[in-house]
Swiss-Prot record:
GO terms for cellular component: Golgi apparatus; plasma membrane. Residues 79-103, 239-366, 378-398 are annotated as: Disordered. It is a single-pass type I membrane protein. This is Uncharacterized protein C11orf24 homolog. Keywords: Cell membrane, Glycoprotein, Golgi apparatus, Membrane, Signal, Transmembrane, Transmembrane helix. It is found in: Cell membrane; Golgi apparatus, trans-Golgi network membrane. It comes from the Eukaryota. Residues 19-427 are extracellular. The keyword Glycoprotein applies.
Length: 477
């Protein structure tokens, strides 16, 4: 009789007031009838219209659950629950404990009211919970950070870590992937290729095993001095341009490594080459790109220097000999001022595609680097083979009816290595003028001194003579 009264009273109590959460949410504490869950009674669950059963949990001393894997630093304390269910009036109470996950099941689980602390439990768990093998074993899945290890689930209705970490969800560790050797690691503004191949970048290209380190505003070659280039260089894979048709110019892919043209363009050498020459190209006015316009040039015409000059004689001269070649693509038509014994400038056909790093060997001296942004010059060291210059077979035929000329806009400043003597001449002239002026000043002072001395002597003599004359005059009287 007492048991029936207790059952009726428990059924009438609202489910939301049957549990309370302590200040530290470690486990569930029931304030009414703590031993109600230990009674094996029939009809202690009320069937509902949706064919689900209402579960009630009794308190058991908390059992610590310690994770062996993952990154949780706190020990999760949970409460073991012995649930008794009676679906459709049948007592099938089966408490179980398992280590894996199971199929989802629909049930209504009695939970504690929500607390204000970040680690409190939710008032009502979702109706579909993954990790429950049957209706009699409600579980809460413990979050894990390692997805490769099978997650552990504890029989608990409250999971409250010591720290304020949320108890639901999946924490995925952000891993840093280090590329293997030979993989290009791209960053914003910098690209470092693996070996030798120059990869396009925004502002900076640094090859690992190449010969040029291109930075913003400065191109430093391997052996030949330092060349100040335009701000920014953007390069791409090397290629060839088909310029047989002036209206159709396409960039066809070729080798991905810079082409060495020292053996293809032999130039006779007649002296030592300048290795420390510095060429400075001003970029106050950007070079206008001639993309979309055919490059005018006489058909099958090659201009070569008539007489080779020495390095010293041509280091300060402006190169006027040009040659039109379109074997490698480039961005604009820019005459470059190399300092070699046989100066030669290659004016390449314009295109709007990014140009590759072309260390074209001219006459045993610096090469040319043309970009799509602004004028860029690059000097590379190389050895030119001795022999006559012959380029008639590789010349490109360009129609002579074009109305545009080679782009020569911009200001070019040639910096030579010869010593400048006008300053010394000016110093000598000023020194001579100073010496002459001081001499004249001293002479004038001496003249004034002599005149003053003579005047002083004459004054004394006049007084004596006056006295003598006066004496004689008085005596006569």
């Amino acid at each position: 009789m007492w048991t029936a009264l207790v059952l009726v009273w428990i059924s009438s109590v609202p489910l939301s007031r049957s549990h309370t959460v302590p200040a530290v949410p470690r486990h569930l504490v029931t304030n009414k009838w703590p031993r109600a869950g230990k009674q094996n009674l029939s009809g202690d669950a009320v069937p509902r219209a949706d064919n689900t059963s209402t579960l009630r949990a009794a308190t058991v001393p908390p059992a610590p659950v310690t994770l062996t894997t993952g990154t949780w630093a706190a020990t999760l304390n949970s409460t073991r629950v012995t649930a008794e269910t009676t679906p459709h009036g049948t007592n099938t109470s089966t408490p179980t404990t398992r280590e894996g996950t199971a199929d989802s099941v629909t049930s209504r689980i009695l939970a504690a009211p929500t607390s204000s602390s970040p680690s409190s439990v939710r008032q009502t768990l979702p109706t579909t919970i993954a990790g429950l093998p049957s209706l009699s074993t409600p579980r809460a899945e413990v979050p894990r950070t390692n997805a490769s290890v099978s997650p552990r689930t504890a029989i608990a209705t409250t999971v409250a870590p010591h720290t304020g970490t949320p108890t639901t969800g999946t924490v995925t560790a952000v891993s840093t992937v280090t590329p293997a050797s030979g993989t290009v690691t791209a960053a914003v503004g910098t690209v470092t290729p693996a070996a030798g191949t120059v990869t396009a970048a925004v502002g900076t290209v640094t090859p690992a095993a190449g010969t040029v380190t291109a930075a913003v505003g400065t191109v430093t070659p391997a052996a030949v001095g330092t060349v100040t280039a335009a701000v920014g260089t953007v390069t791409s894979a090397a290629g060839t341009i088909n310029t047989s048709d002036p209206h159709a110019r396409t960039l066809s892919p070729a080798k991905s490594t810079p082409t060495n043209t020292s053996s293809r363009n032999p130039i006779p050498t007649s002296g030592a080459q300048t290795q420390g020459t510095t060429i400075q190209v001003t970029t106050d006015q950007p070079v206008h790109s001639t993309a979309g316009r055919p490059t005018p040039s006489p058909s099958n015409t090659t201009l070569e220097p008539n007489t080779p000059k020495s390095v010293a004689s041509t280091s300060s001269a402006v190169v006027t000999t040009t040659q039109v070649q379109t074997k490698e693509p480039s961005a604009s038509t820019v005459p470059v001022l190399p300092t070699s014994m046989s100066p030669e400038v290659e004016a390449t056909s314009p295109t709007t595609q990014p140009s590759p790093l072309l260390p074209t060997q001219g006459t045993g001296g610096p090469g040319i680097l043309l970009t799509t942004e602004q004028v860029g010059t690059k000097a590379t060291a190389g050895t030119a083979s001795a022999g006559p210059t012959s380029r008639s077979s590789g010349d490109v035929k360009v129609p002579t009816t074009a109305s545009c000329q080679l782009s020569t806009q911009g200001q070019y400043l040639v910096v030579t290595t010869d010593p400048l003597t006008p300053s010394l001449v000016n110093k000598m002239f000023l020194l001579v003028v100073l010496i002459v002026g001081v001499t004249l000043f001293i002479a004038v002072l001496m003249m004034f001194a002599l005149q003053a001395y003579e005047s002083y002597k004459k004054k004394d003599y006049t007084q004596v003579d006056y006295l003598i004359n006066g004496m004689y005059a008085d005596s006569e009287m």
